[in-house]
């Protein structure tokens, strides 16, 4: 009964000061909502384990290389076999290929299918379950012409085949027949397989790794230069992650000595799978957490100041009610009820704000969160919100209530006709203002530094013109385009078609690769240096482009000549190299006319041009902007750049 009476009294009191009530509610809602949103994101990314069994002991296996020792690079299939033979720290190691795509050719129009090529134990390492059929077995990973098999994801199966029973059915990818042996459970997500994918893309199907060479030609049982694999390893029980990482690194050291022409300068790096998937979010999240805490403190100070000012206005009212017989406990209960009511409304608004913010962030493709990370309102978020509300109640309800109810009545009545506040309230208000300004100043400085960093990121000089530029990706992983001359003719026809579109200034086809093989990174040795000496091996990224591509992209050609139509796959290999590449190959010398030999190749490459540095297909954090560019050898994955007027 007293509670209902206190609630009615609080509603009447707050109704007389709607501006005060709205301001307090909005301030609290924003403070609590912002903090709960940030901590919910941190919980989903940092605190919560990946949705895989024993995920804390799953390690991502990759290779580090000069200029990027922290790992993330690929290794070859022969290196994978060496890892299996020398492994002492993992009870299971699986390999998988970089993200790729094939075309489902059973319908009237081809359908893109995102593929992960994996070894047989890959899916079981991730705890995958099937809703129908089975997972891969060892005998499924065949390098011969045996009948190929495939496992479909639940989402892809529902999207393309509805509720049809697919087990045992034959589908065609790139006109190659595959027998469906399994369909994964609806909840399974292959986050490692999505590492090299575009934002929002998920794996649609899994194919045994042995079939990759037949379908893509990108992997070989014997070529140590064909670095296109990553690995997953489960650390043995009783062994620390640090010990497993050190043991894996030692394998890389031994291979570097055993194969100096292909593996020298490379390291093996093992990190937790979680770090590889979401480690890039850790630093920004800690910055956000710090900023949100400051925001909450500022909100607390604002609300405390509002409550103190409100209490000063009500001193005479409280004094009169106390003189009429209202006890101190009753006044405290009423004041607490008012504050609890304000906090309750603010908590509801904060929960709505958090729900909306998490949904918006979850659907924001540029955030590029792994598919195993789910931003959603759950019991942990609600617990965080309740905890923040509890702290707020203690700060804004109890202390002001005690202050207001224990006021000296004679002082209150004596001061009621004079402007100003009591000395105690004045000192408290000044302290709150000082703390609020201090916190705001720190937050302002941090925001300024963040904006400065953001501005630096948005003004990075990529070395080519990015204004009025459209890009698209073509994937020619199809038997129809498995011959290089067919791909070359296709790109020639594509350029003619696109150049005829209104507004298109030019069309640039940019593809990775040495002739006949797709690769982003190539080790090469300058002429006159011994290739078996690791110190002579220079790493460079290599691309295949059409004649005129440099000028079309705004990359200055400093010396030498551009490519011509005669620089095709039948002509001697020539290259235009960047300034950084020239400095690495021949410090202080003119590179024109000089030659270099890519490791694992027979044909020398002659330098015919020197171009300015540019960042193409490279990580922004990499300091090495060297790019080797060679004609011919267009791989199945092409980037198309369309400058427009």
What do these predicted regions represent?
Residues 1-21, 273-278, 306-333, 337, ...:
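Alpha-helical transmembrane segments of integral membrane proteins
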Residues 17-45, 298-300, 344-348, 429-453:
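Short, strongly hydrophobic transmembrane alpha-helices
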Residues 66-71, 111-114, 234, 278-280, ...:
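Acyl-group handling in specialized metabolite and lipid biosynthesis
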Residues 101, 115-139, 143, 147-286, ...:
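Mid-to-C-terminal secondary-structure elements
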Residues 278-295, 380-384:
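N-terminal membrane-entry
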């Amino acid at each position: 009964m007293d509670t209902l009476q206190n609630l009615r009294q609080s509603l009447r009191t707050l109704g007389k000061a709607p501006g005060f009530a709205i301001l307090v509610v909005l301030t609290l809602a924003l403070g609590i909502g912002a903090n709960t949103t940030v901590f919910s994101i941190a919980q989903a990314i940092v605190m919560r384990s990946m949705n895989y069994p024993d995920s804390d002991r799953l390690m991502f296996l990759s290779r580090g290389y000069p200029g990027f020792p922290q790992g993330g690079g690929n290794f070859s299939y022969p290196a994978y076999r060496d890892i299996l033979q020398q492994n002492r720290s993992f009870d299971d190691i699986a390999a998988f290929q970089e993200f790729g795509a094939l075309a489902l050719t059973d319908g009237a129009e081809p359908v893109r299918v995102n593929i992960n090529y994996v070894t047989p134990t890959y899916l079981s390492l991730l705890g995958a379950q099937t809703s129908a059929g089975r997972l891969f077995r060892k005998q499924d990973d065949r390098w011969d012409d045996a009948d190929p098999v495939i496992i479909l994801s639940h989402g892809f199966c529902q999207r393309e085949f509805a509720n049809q029973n697919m087990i045992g059915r034959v589908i065609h990818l790139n006109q190659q027949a595959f027998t469906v042996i399994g369909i994964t459970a609806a909840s399974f997500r292959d986050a490692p397989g999505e590492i090299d994918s575009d934002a929002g893309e998920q794996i649609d199907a899994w194919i045994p790794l042995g079939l990759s060479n037949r379908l893509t030609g990108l992997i070989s049982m014997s070529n140590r230069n064909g670095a296109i694999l990553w690995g997953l390893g489960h650390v043995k029980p009783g062994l620390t992650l640090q010990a497993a990482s050190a043991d894996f690194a030692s394998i890389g050291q031994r291979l570097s000595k055993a194969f100096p022409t292909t593996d020298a300068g490379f390291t093996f790096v093992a990190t937790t799978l979680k770090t590889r998937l979401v480690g890039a979010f850790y630093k920004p999240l800690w910055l956000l957490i710090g900023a949100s805490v400051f925001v909450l403190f500022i909100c607390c100070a604002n609300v405390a100041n509002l409550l103190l000012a409100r209490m000063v206005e009500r001193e005479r009212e409280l004094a009169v009610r106390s003189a009429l017989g209202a006890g101190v406990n009753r006044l405290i209960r009423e004041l607490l009820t008012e504050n609890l009511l304000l906090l309750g409304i603010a908590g509801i608004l904060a929960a709505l704000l958090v729900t909306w913010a998490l949904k918006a962030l979850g659907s924001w493709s540029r955030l590029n969160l792994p598919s195993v990370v789910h931003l959603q309102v759950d019991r942990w978020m609600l617990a965080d919100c309740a905890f923040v509300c509890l702290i707020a109640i203690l700060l804004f309800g109890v202390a002001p209530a005690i202050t207001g109810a224990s006021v000296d009545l004679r002082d209150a009545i004596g001061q009621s006709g004079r402007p100003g506040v009591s000395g105690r309230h004045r000192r408290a208000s000044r302290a709150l203002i000082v703390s609020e300004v201090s916190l705001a100043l720190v937050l302002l400085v941090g925001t300024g530094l963040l904006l400065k960093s953001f501005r630096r990121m948005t003004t990075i000089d990529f070395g080519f013109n990015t204004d009025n530029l459209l890009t698209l990706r073509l994937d020619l992983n199809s038997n129809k385009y498995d011959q290089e001359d067919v791909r070359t003719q296709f790109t020639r026809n594509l350029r003619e078609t696109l150049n005829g579109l209104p507004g298109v200034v030019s069309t640039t086809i940019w593809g990775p690769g040495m002739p006949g093989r797709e690769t982003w990174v190539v080790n090469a040795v300058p002429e006159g240096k011994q290739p078996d000496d690791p110190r002579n091996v220079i790493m460079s990224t290599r691309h295949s482009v059409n004649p005129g591509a440099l000028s079309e992209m705004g990359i200055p050609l400093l010396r030498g000549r551009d490519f011509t139509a005669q620089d095709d796959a039948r002509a001697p290999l020539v290259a235009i190299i960047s300034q950084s590449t020239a400095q690495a190959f021949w410090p202080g010398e003119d590179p024109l006319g000089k030659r270099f030999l890519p490791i694992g190749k027979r044909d020398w490459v002659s330098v015919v041009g020197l171009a300015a540095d540019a960042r193409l297909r490279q990580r922004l954090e990499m300091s090495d902007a060297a790019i080797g560019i060679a004609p011919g050898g267009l791989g199945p994955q092409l980037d198309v750049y369309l400058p427009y007027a």
